[in-house]
């Protein structure tokens, strides 16, 4: 094992506190330098991966799951008998489920039937009720069903991850500040897949004013290039490419959109695991593939790219990510 770096050696072991609940453990995820993958792909930039699967329920969505429920509590919108109902592609549902379990709320989640069985089992494990909608309808179908459930369920509320301002706000307050502090502000590109748009909006709104030369790069499925003006089509990159432009997405912070196809996302996620030992999901592969593309450009030599690794690979065991393994 390598000796600790000078910076890590000065830290005292432990966190210096005991968390009052699992919700308090969200955030402060590590940023890790990719040491071999960029070289293997001919990239001459420094590529850093922010590993969001270090959150308690193993994804970036833990941040918004906690933030949305806490915001509704503070606003007096929910009580002990409230039923939370949300359309979700999976990881937001798991985030809401662990927070709801911790705080004692009933939760119903609506999702496309194409979502992995691991996500569904985890949701049930955490006590959530699951309603599946046709895969061909994408997230639009799940949203319509969830809205109907809210209309017909007394004392129910929808957090509305695609519209809820607590979503980008938590990334402004936490994710952006973590990236800035951990890199010392030395960041030239920020790369993130777009699902709800909360991560790229929150981070972009905070970091671009501080570093005007910073380029914010959105990643979307090549098969469903809605951000680029194309049509929604089925794809295998779960968690991004919802098929519409989310209300909370601030497109003004985006400098570039990179389209990654499902096969490349899967191939890159596998390479990330085998070459770097970083077990990310399919959307992680998409973000890293985009970062590698950018890193190979002549103008990117010597630059620093931070890419979001949103979730853990184990959540995709039944998907194409693990086919043939």
Residue ranges and their predicted role:
Residues 1-325:
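PLP-dependent amino-acid enzyme catalytic core
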């Amino acid at each position: 094992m390598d000796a600790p770096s000078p910076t890590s050696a000065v830290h005292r072991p432990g966190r210096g506190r005991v968390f009052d609940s699992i919700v308090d453990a969200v955030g402060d995820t590590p940023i890790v330098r990719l040491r071999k993958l960029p070289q293997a792909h001919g990239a001459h930039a420094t590529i850093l991966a922010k590993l969001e699967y270090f959150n308690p329920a193993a994804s970036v969505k833990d941040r918004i799951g906690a933030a949305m429920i806490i915001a509704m509590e503070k606003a007096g919108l929910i009580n002990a008998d409230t039923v939370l109902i949300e359309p979700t592609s999976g990881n937001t549902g798991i985030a809401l489920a662990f927070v709801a379990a911790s705080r004692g709320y009933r939760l119903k989640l609506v999702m496309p039937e194409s979502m992995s069985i691991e996500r569904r089992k985890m949701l049930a494990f955490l006590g959530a009720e699951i309603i599946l909608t046709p895969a061909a309808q994408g997230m639009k179908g799940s949203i319509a069903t969830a809205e109907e459930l809210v209309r017909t369920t007394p004392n129910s509320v929808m957090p509305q991850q695609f519209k809820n301002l607590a979503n980008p706000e938590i990334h402004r307050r936490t994710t952006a500040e973590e990236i800035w502090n951990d890199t010392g502000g030395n960041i030239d590109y920020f790369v993130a897949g777009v699902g709800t748009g909360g991560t790229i909006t929150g981070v972009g709104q905070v970091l671009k004013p501080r570093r005007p030369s910073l380029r914010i790069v959105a990643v979307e499925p090549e098969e469903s290039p809605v951000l680029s003006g194309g049509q929604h089509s089925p794809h295998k990159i779960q968690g991004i490419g919802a098929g519409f432009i989310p209300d909370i997405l601030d497109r003004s912070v985006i400098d570039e959109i990179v389209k990654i196809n499902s096969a490349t996302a899967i191939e890159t996620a596998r390479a990330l695991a085998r070459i770097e030992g970083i077990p990310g999901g399919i959307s992680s592969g998409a973000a890293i593939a985009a970062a590698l593309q950018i890193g190979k450009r002549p103008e990117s030599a010597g630059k620093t790219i931070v890419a979001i690794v949103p979730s853990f690979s184990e959540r995709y065991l039944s998907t194409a990510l693990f086919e043939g393994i």
